[in-house]
Amino acid sequence: MAKGKDILQHPYIKVGRLKMNVAKAAHLKCADIVVSQNYLKHIEKKHSTELKTLGIDSYSYVKLIVDNYNQIRQGSDDSVLLVIFRDGNHHDVAAIKLTYITSKDVWEVKTAQPRNSKDVLKRKLLW
């Protein structure tokens, strides 16, 4: 795992990259995707039940989405959502919220969670 410091000087981990072809198609910046230790702790705390059900930790959940997303949707404000969309139960979407940090040229993970597809489908599809 690539480690460094985020803009608040907290350790962060590179979890992937928004690839050039996808970024171009979605009109987004091609850049590394990073997550801070603080956000991993936040995800673990807020979504421990879901993570235990899946049998994975917060890092593995974020990495799973970064490696397997099949949609990008507009998030709130300037954020975007990387989404694994699949049919099934109430929580049939896995999503991470990313915000682009211009000064560091990275996409930072702000949260990751299972979501109801109805909420996600209301968001503009970018890719």
Residue ranges and their predicted role:
Residues 1-127:
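Ribonuclease/tRNase effector modules and their secretory precursors
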